[in-house]
A protein has these predicted regions:
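Hydrophobic alpha-helical targeting segments used for export or membrane insertion
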Residues: 9-13
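Surface-exposed, charged secondary-structure patches
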Residues: 29, 77-118
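Short, low-complexity N-terminal intrinsically disordered segments enriched in polar/charged residues
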Residues: 3-8, 19-47
């Protein structure tokens, strides 16, 4: 009888801690929504608030910029290094966003940064990963 009580107690504890762990994972995923990821990207690029940017970028993310006829490519580490150099620097631009495509697995958001004399259009692709919505690709064009 004592063994049966011990086994029952063990199963109850296992179920309790398993449910608590699942709730923690869900809460973290709710933080990584499309809106959170895009807002974090904009805050880093426009306002120099870089503290949360790494969390919303996928490890294999690619960043591509077309400047005139020149194509520049960067990975996550390189883009984070570049953004860190502009920490707390406020860009002199106005920003607008528009969702170009969205479904349960993928979202593409256009982020326009309008400066005096030119506009930088960023096409931000986000994927719904097991860790929440992550930026997987950013393609930037200067007009």
């Amino acid at each position: 009888m004592k063994t049966l009580k011990t086994i029952a107690l063990g199963l109850i504890l296992l179920a309790t801690f398993g449910a608590a762990n699942a709730a923690t994972k869900k809460a973290n995923n709710e933080i990584l929504t499309v809106n959170h990821a895009v807002s974090t990207y904009i805050n880093a690029m426009v306002h120099g608030q870089v503290s949360d940017l790494s969390a919303v970028i996928d490890q294999k993310a690619e960043f591509t910029m077309l400047r005139g006829s020149k194509m520049l490519s960067f990975n996550k580490t390189e883009i984070l290094g570049s953004v860190q150099q502009n920490e707390n620097v406020e860009q002199a631009c106005t920003t607008t966003t528009s969702v170009r495509e969205s479904n349960n697995d993928l979202t593409v958001v256009k982020v326009d940064m309008k400066y005096e004399g030119f506009t930088r259009s960023n096409y931000v692709t986000l994927a719904n990963t097991s860790e929440g919505w992550k930026i997987t690709n950013v393609y930037s064009v200067f007009k």
